[in-house]
């Protein structure tokens, strides 16, 4: 069994965790609380249990830029978008990580980035015009079930219903690419530089 934690041990654990993982202040605080629960707290020379200030320790690491919620949110949002996840999924992931509301809003994708992520997911999962030709042809029930399943998959991934509906109704991949391109043009960013994850 590992010994109880003193203030130096907590500081070392916090530094090790921040060095090893991209994290938020809230996650680091939860990690330290969990470690205290697992191992307990050490006693001082008088036999009293120490009372560490975890919030102050986390605040100090934030002050030293070892923990940066903004950088975490930016990186995580970009990563999820590049994997084809939608805005709702990104927001939920950041909220779960303890990122504050203003930062979540600041890193929410724009319309063009949302469309781009939806198109990427459809391409990866072979949905809509990216799917296998002839699947369910002639059987309206099979077509309807496949469409409902595809819509559900896109909604679970955090995409807007309108985006899922448009992509699944598209006849050709070029139609989807044009739709994504129009959103980038409307944002004044034809190359997709500003409105990215």
Predicted stretch roles:
Residues 1-197:
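An alpha-helical, amphipathic repeat domain used for nucleic-acid recognition
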């Amino acid at each position: 069994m590992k010994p109880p934690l003193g203030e130096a041990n907590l500081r070392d654990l916090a530094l090790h965790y921040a060095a090893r993982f991209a994290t938020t202040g809230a996650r680091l605080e939860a990690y330290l609380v969990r470690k205290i629960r697992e191992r307990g707290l050490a006693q001082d020379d008088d036999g009293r249990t120490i009372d560490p200030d975890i919030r102050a320790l986390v605040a100090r690491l934030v002050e030293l830029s070892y923990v940066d919620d903004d950088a975490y949110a930016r990186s995580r949002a970009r990563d999820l978008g590049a994997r084809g996840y939608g805005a709702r999924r990104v927001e939920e992931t950041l909220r779960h990580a303890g990122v504050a509301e203003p930062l979540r809003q600041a890193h929410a994708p724009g319309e063009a980035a949302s469309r781009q992520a939806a198109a990427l997911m459809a391409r990866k999962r072979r949905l809509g015009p990216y799917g296998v030709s002839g699947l369910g042809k002639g059987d309206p029930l099979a077509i309807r079930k496949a469409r409902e399943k595809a819509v559900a998959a896109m909604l679970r991934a955090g995409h807007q219903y309108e985006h899922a509906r448009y992509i699944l109704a598209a006849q050709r991949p070029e139609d989807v690419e044009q739709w994504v391109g129009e959103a980038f043009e409307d944002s004044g960013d034809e190359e997709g530089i500003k409105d990215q994850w």
